[in-house]
Design a protein with these regions (language model features):
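Glycine-rich NAD(P)-binding loop of Rossmann-like domains
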Residues: 89, 119-153, 182
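C-terminal helix-to-coil terminal segments
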Residues: 89-104, 118, 261-321
Length: 321
């Protein structure tokens, strides 16, 4: 019988039951392994790998036909040379992380707008200072750079909170979700940034997105603008961002991703002014709804795979998503 290697540690009994039900329907058996490790002497047994398998372990999977990553960002898996053959299908779990990451974006955005980091210091010093100015998402001008599942989930939440205008920016100009008031392409980004109060970045790591927020584009943002990045650290000229924050040329930034990761203890990013820094945890798999969706999406595409249909979350390795 054909076999699936499920290489993850979060599977509950209910998750396993769902995976095994879908697998049985499709003529597969399932074996489970700890997240991040598929034994080399067993790897060749599997036609499908689902979960988190390090790129360097894939060569041993001589009969691999489909790798389904249990996460959204697959930049480490787009190089054809890591696979036993160039025809291996690659898919991700886009659609599982929109809720949890959009909530993170909303949280850090409100923290910055409401001056929470400064109020935290005030309270730690046992002071009763109420004079800091605060702002609101309501009535604000927001640009979402990257209008996939994550960016769009945030746009919907921002719209519900009364954002004045939400602009979506993406690689190609297609009709966007109703949450977006205006849609633009990457080539039109320069015209959008000067009108942006809150810039949210939710982009994959590709050649096209590398330093898309360049030094020149950071300078186009208003001095009272905020930047939030939950995609990949490579999308921002990090040195230029630090200079802008330290020089007071931006109101603040929240980064859940950076370069490099993990960040060395002596890196200047730690000490950058008006910066909220988190260690790439916005999409943490601890939320039950994220885990449930991840398994649900895999089972859906497993049925597509078995029926010879196109995978819904198939990744184009040439463009990176």
């Amino acid at each position: 019988m054909k076999k699936i290697a499920a290489v993850e540690s979060f599977f509950s009994p209910e998750h396993r039951a769902a995976i095994e039900k879908a697998a049985a329907e499709c003529g597969f058996a399932v074996d489970y392994f700890t997240q991040g490790h598929l034994p080399a002497d067993q790897a060749a047994d599997y036609e499908i790998i689902y979960g988190m398998c390090p790129p360097q372990e894939l060569k041993a999977a001589a009969n691999l036909k489909w790798l389904c990553c249990s996460f959204a960002g697959v930049d480490a898996y787009t190089d054809e040379t890591i696979y036993p053959n160039p025809d291996v299908l690659l898919s991700n779990s886009s659609g599982a992380y929109g809720i949890t990451i959009s909530e993170h974006i909303l949280m850090v955005t409100l923290m910055m707008l409401r001056q929470m980091p400064k109020f935290e210091e005030i309270v730690k010093n046992r002071e009763w200072e109420k004079g800091l100015s605060m702002r609101s998402i309501c009535g604000s001008s927001i640009t979402v750079l990257g209008t996939g599942d994550i960016g769009t989930n945030f746009a919907r939440r921002a719209k519900a909170l009364g954002a004045k205008v939400i602009r979506g920016v993406r690689r190609t100009k297609k009709a966007g979700d109703p949450a977006y008031d205006e849609m633009y392409t990457f080539e039109e980004l320069d015209s959008v940034l000067p009108k942006t109060e809150i810039l949210v970045m939710a982009l994959p790591a590709t050649k096209e997105t590398n330093h898309i927020l360049s030094r020149e584009r950071i300078a186009l943002l208003p001095e009272d603008a905020y930047v939030v990045n939950v995609g990949r650290g490579s999308a921002i000229d990090q040195e230029a961002l630090m200079e802008a924050l330290n020089g007071g040329h931006l109101a603040g930034a929240a980064l859940d991703v950076c370069v490099p990761e993990p960040l060395p203890k002596d890196h200047p990013l730690w000490d950058t002014k008006n910066l909220l820094l988190t260690p790439h945890i916005s999409g943490n798999m601890s939320l039950g709804i994220t885990r449930d969706l991840d398994v649900e999406l895999f089972c859906e595409d497993l049925r597509n795979y078995a029926a010879g249909r196109r995978l819904k979350r198939l990744v184009d390795r040439k463009i990176g998503y």
